[in-house]
Amino acid sequence: MADLTCTTPFLLYPSLVIILFFYSINHHNQIFSSVVDDDPSCRLSSSPQAVFSSFRIFPFRSSSSCLNITSNNNSTSEVVVVEEVDEAVERIEEGLAMARAAIRKAGEKNLRRDRDRTNNSDVGVVSNGSVYLNAFTFHQSHKEMEKRFKIWTYREGEAPLFHKGPLNNIYAIEGQFMDEIENGNSRFKAASPEEATVFYIPVGIVNIIRFVYRPYTSYARDRLQNIVKDYISLISNRYPYWNRSRGADHFFLSCHDWAPDVSAVDPELYKHFIRALCNANSSEGFTPMRDVSLPEINIPHSQLGFVHTGEPPQNRKLLAFFAGGSHGDVRKILFQHWKEKDKDVLVYENLPKTMNYTKMMDKAKFCLCPSGWEVASPRIVESLYSGCVPVIIADYYVLPFSDVLNWKTFSVHIPISKMPDIKKILEAITEEEYLNMQRRVLEVRKHFVINRPSKPYDMLHMIMHSIWLRRLNVRIPLSQ
């Protein structure tokens, strides 16, 4: 057996944090422990074999002894009675089982369609083109999500460290999602934890770094890690929800570069926890079967949901374009080979004043999207908005929504080692192939637009769908 414990006392935190943001925690600061079953059959599978091949969903955990959590001995009146929790779990799991069956049936229908060469007009908004791994299963899964998916946000903690995030600029997805679920009229907002499919830990990573770390005298992640870890300690002592699943139906969401480091302090505690991250680097611990890859999007003020058409394909005479700072090793290599060296592949570190960044993307067939300090880049979404085929230059990057989107049909991937051959690779793409990719860019970009309130198949819905898929891969057992 292994105990998951938090050892950092709250008295070590700055008084500002204690007074303003953790006023309730000192009443519930006993560290929780959970019993982790060492039976190999109960461990989360690392096998990539898919239950739904179109989604790359991984094998369900069905053993009744899995996720066996001991109840907290120090229960209070705020802790939900186990019998009531079991009834709620049973009801939710029955609904999820029905959803899985419906999605499987849709997948079988897709196989019959392929055999019979019939059309897929009944799929509706996701019917056209080949941007999806399986349009039928995606459409059915989205329908099931709208019917059954509910998110409960824990109420503990106060703004700005919790329940508040940026609504604009590079980390805006954190605040937009949080605001949609907490303050909007989202259909996915649970009325009570008993009807929740998943549980949202509303930690504001950006604001923690902004308010706790300034002035920046140290970039050590321990303060960030301790705040999140102690928050989990609080909610796991107060409620049974974390303990019954070992966090497998809990998630947090952040686009900040530091967000992946939250779990580094205690890998066992976060072993099953869903992390929704922009920095989806599989070489640095991002696990596609558990974690969610977020699109990185830069939202200017007053431009929410902004998409422009760009030039039609026949007017795009420039082969490829990139302009951006020398952030990280990938871009240094890009500049070494291509910076202001070719008239067909225009690469700038500092864009000349005579050029307009957006208009240059509008004129290019392909837009280079090299990694910066981390693997993700907002240029992928910017390319889609401009109708420019994104050229993703990154290794180990798990692309957003790759459970349902077939990125190969509307983007080009060039490994870092092949950067000297960028022009050769792009020129080898035929005009017909390019036109097909560009058409699919226009089709798929609806999934990368943020609307408030969220709309079916937009970016926020797609993020929720990614979380929904991870929840479909979990079966929570009833108490023994």
Swiss-Prot record:
Residues 26-480 are lumenal. Its main location: Golgi. The lineage of its organism: Eukaryota, Viridiplantae, Streptophyta, Embryophyta, Tracheophyta. One of its GO terms (molecular function) is glycosyltransferase activity. It comes from the Eukaryota. Glycans are attached at residues 68, 74, 119, 128, 243, 281, 356. It is an enzyme of class 2 (transferase). GO terms for biological process: cell wall organization; protein glycosylation. Belongs to the glycosyltransferase 47 family. It is a single-pass type II membrane protein. InterPro entries: Exostosin, Exostosin_GT47. It comes from Arabidopsis thaliana. It is found in: Golgi apparatus membrane. This is Probable glycosyltransferase At5g11130. Keywords: Cell wall biogenesis/degradation, Glycoprotein, Glycosyltransferase, Golgi apparatus, Membrane, Signal-anchor, Transferase, Transmembrane, Transmembrane helix. It holds the Pfam family Exostosin_GT47. GO terms for cellular component: Golgi membrane. May be involved in cell wall biosynthesis. Residues 1-4 are cytoplasmic.
